[in-house]
C-alpha cells in the first residue's frame, strides 16, 4: 500500500483546489509517484474533500468547492 505524509496530502490538496487534474499530470507536477498520488486522491474523495468531475470526454479530480464552481459556470452557459 502506498504510504504518504500529511505534507504530501496537503501538497495534493493545494493543487486540487486550483484546477481540475488528471492523476498522472498531478503526479508529474508534484514530482510524486503516481500510485501515491492516486492513494491520496482516493483518501481525499473518501473524506468528502475531493471529487471526480467529467468534462464529457475526460474525468478529472479537484476539490469539491472547485467542482461546484465549475458546475455553476457550466449551468450559466
From Swiss-Prot:
Superkingdom of this protein's organism: Archaea
UniProt cross-references to Gene3D superfamilies, sorted A to Z: Winged helix-like DNA-binding domain superfamily/Winged helix DNA-binding domain (1.10.10.10)
Signal sequence extent: none
Function: May play an essential role in dissimilatory sulfite reduction.
Family per record: To D.vulgaris DsvD.
Name of the featured protein: Protein DsrD
Organism the protein comes from: Archaeoglobus fulgidus (strain ATCC 49558 / DSM 4304 / JCM 9628 / NBRC 100126 / VC-16)
Amino acid at each position: 500500500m502506498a504510504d504518504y505524509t500529511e505534507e504530501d496530502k496537503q501538497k495534493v490538496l493545494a493543487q486540487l483546489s486550483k484546477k481540475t487534474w488528471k492523476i498522472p499530470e498531478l503526479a508529474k507536477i508534484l514530482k510524486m509517484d503516481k500510485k501515491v498520488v492516486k492513494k491520496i486522491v482516493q483518501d481525499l474523495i473518501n473524506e468528502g474533500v475531493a471529487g471526480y468531475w467529467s468534462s464529457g470526454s475526460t474525468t478529472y479530480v479537484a476539490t469539491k468547492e472547485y467542482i461546484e464552481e465549475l458546475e455553476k459556470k457550466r449551468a450559466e452557459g
